[in-house]
């Protein structure tokens, strides 16, 4: 480009060289100034040519302008994403190094503690390792206390247990109170259990109830008296508040005893599995007719020596604790899974249906001795759990049989509930 430009400027320089008298020195500045101007113009021309060439090449691409813009935006986003990933990776490395450094310091401190050394923080606060552990230990929970009495009649071989009162019980209900009652039994035999009445909404109940156990004095030393306080809940399992255990071999029964003892945390009782029974209920309001169908039972408790039972079912219609009518099924021999499918009807006017209970008891038939109860349930408006739901479903679906499985409960437990509902 510079050669072309010089060639174009030759006519200007030529006249100066033709004059013999003109000195050659002044011509140099003119040539330099002209040369610098030419260089500036050539750079602008080059940029313009490159620009035109670039746009010409773009125009040759068979894509609309918006597509090219979109491609440029995508390329920019990819570039930004790459930059972000690189920055994040660098930051993560720094954090990881700090974390490893801190972990190493922590391990070093732990090793120091194991060697019996004190770290700087403990030294500043004046705390020793033993003092720190003492602060972490929780204080024993206060579960309240129970007052009871013991009296043994040597002539009658009879132990009388008095459940007098409890105090400072913890609140287990939403209202800040509890509904306590006491279960009394002698270990290792859990079959014979007594229960006090439920005292509503109190943390300091006065029971003042007595219970007797027929036990020879020679056998009494191997037994443990348990008095467990529970919080009654109508719609769920009763929660244990605490218990008092009295090993009878540690008590001098030569004279009556009366004392207070602190309640200890009690273990949740594993309920004895007695089996399940399936019943169907049907009520026709217009006819005032209740039909109870005993369908079947399963997994019944073994009552006979051979590991089986001879089960049958009794049905009692009750009102206010009184038995109005009773029915019973046939006996099924040597089985723990009997199938009955027997129906029984009771005449109950609609205005009385909410005042009655149907008590279902599964018994083991014994030809020689007394028939023993395996388990029991009752349904009615004052029942709880699945029994109450079964009764409610029956009333909500008149003329329609409603079947439901129920877990059998100990006879004493059901009788206690029926007694409270009088």
UniProtKB/Swiss-Prot annotation:
Residues 1-60 are vesicular. Changing residue 54 to A: No binding of fragment 1-61 to BoNT/B heavy chain. Ca(2+) 2 binds at residues 172-173, 231, 233, 239. Ca(2+) 4 binds at residues 304, 310, 364, 366. GO terms for biological process: calcium-dependent activation of synaptic vesicle fusion; cell differentiation; positive regulation of dendrite extension; regulation of calcium ion-dependent exocytosis; regulation of synaptic vesicle exocytosis; synaptic vesicle exocytosis; vesicle-mediated transport. Residues 119-139 have a biased composition (Acidic residues). SMART domains: C2. Glycans are attached at residue 32. The modification Phosphothreonine is found at residues 125, 128, 202, 386. Residues 16-30 have a biased composition (Low complexity). GO terms for cellular component: axon; chromaffin granule membrane; dense core granule; exocytic vesicle; neuromuscular junction; plasma membrane; synaptic vesicle membrane; terminal bouton. Residues 31-41 have a biased composition (Polar residues). The keyword Membrane applies. This is Synaptotagmin-2. It comes from Rattus norvegicus (Rat).
